[in-house]
């Protein structure tokens, strides 16, 4: 089974250089990864360099300035960046508030969307998914659910209803994002199970959240625990969750 990590941060001004990520990937037999630009950084050149230095191992999602009307998006796309990070309620600070969403749709980019449940259920995101039904949007961090939800998980269930939109997928993070430490987790809410039931395995993709995951369960455990937790699933379903979904969406071969 090929394993793809769909949520990694790396850089030279914040976090760690790519060699640190590659060490963890190689140690854990992770084949490929998606470099998600970190908040506040609009120079995506380092990610382009990473893709050029290690061909076939990485895809990347850019961030552009709030006032960009699409021109910078086009420039980075021409350099091989296949995705863009746009918060679910994002609006550009230019003549066309939807310019960045519109450009992403025109270029067939993948949107990696940081979010909260309220943002996903709000009017701004609803407008986007209605206007751009063919734009693939990958919901980050299990919908931003965090450690807060309590049964019966009404807000999270409302988020999962978005699975009826075929252009949406969802990232499954390390369980330390929604399970109390320490590791191994003993109190596991059924959120991951619910997400897989709603989106089906072919629209769920694992992402470690490296390097912030290092302050939770750590990189290796962020993969080890869900792999063990979902051992009851078929080999095909697990292949989708831990690699094939990401390869399909992020154009990794």
PLM region spans:
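Active-site metal-binding loops of divalent metal-dependent hydrolases
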Residues: 8, 38, 142, 208-210
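Mid-to-C-terminal alpha-helical segments outside catalytic/metal-binding sites
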Residues: 1-9, 15-32, 194, 198-205, ...
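Conserved protein kinase catalytic core
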Residues: 11-13, 146-147, 177, 215
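Catalytic pocket-lining loop regions of alpha/beta-barrel enzymes
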Residues: 91-205
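Mid-domain alpha/beta scaffold segments of enzyme catalytic cores
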Residues: 1-99, 103-107, 119, 162, ...
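Short beta-strand segments
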Residues: 5, 34-37, 62-63, 171-174, ...
């Amino acid at each position: 089974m090929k394993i793809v990590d769909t949520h990694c941060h790396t850089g030279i001004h914040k976090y760690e250089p790519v060699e640190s990520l590659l060490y963890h990937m190689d140690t854990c037999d992770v084949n490929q990864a998606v470099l998600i630009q970190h908040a506040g950084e609009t120079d995506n050149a380092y990610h382009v360099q990473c893709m050029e230095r290690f061909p076939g191992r990485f895809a990347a999602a850019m961030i552009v300035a709030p006032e960009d009307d699409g021109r910078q998006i086009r420039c980075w796309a021409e350099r091989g960046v296949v995705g863009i990070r746009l918060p679910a309620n994002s609006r550009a600070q230019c003549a066309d508030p939807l310019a960045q969403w519109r450009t992403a749709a025109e270029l067939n980019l993948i949107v990696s969307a940081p979010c909260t449940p309220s943002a996903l259920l709000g009017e701004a995101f609803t407008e986007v998914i209605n206007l751009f039904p063919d734009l693939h949007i990958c919901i980050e961090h299990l919908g931003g659910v965090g450690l807060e939800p309590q049964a019966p998980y009404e807000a999270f269930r409302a988020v999962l209803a978005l699975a009826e939109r075929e252009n949406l997928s969802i990232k499954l993070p390390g369980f330390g994002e929604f399970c109390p430490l320490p590791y191994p987790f003993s109190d596991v809410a059924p959120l991951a199970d619910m997400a897989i039931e709603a989106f089906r395995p072919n629209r769920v993709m694992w992402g470690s959240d490296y390097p912030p995951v290092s302050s939770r369960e750590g990189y290796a455990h962020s993969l080890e625990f869900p792999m063990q937790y979902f051992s009851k699933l078929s080999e095909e379903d697990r292949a989708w969750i831990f690699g094939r979904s990401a390869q399909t969406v992020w154009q990794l071969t």
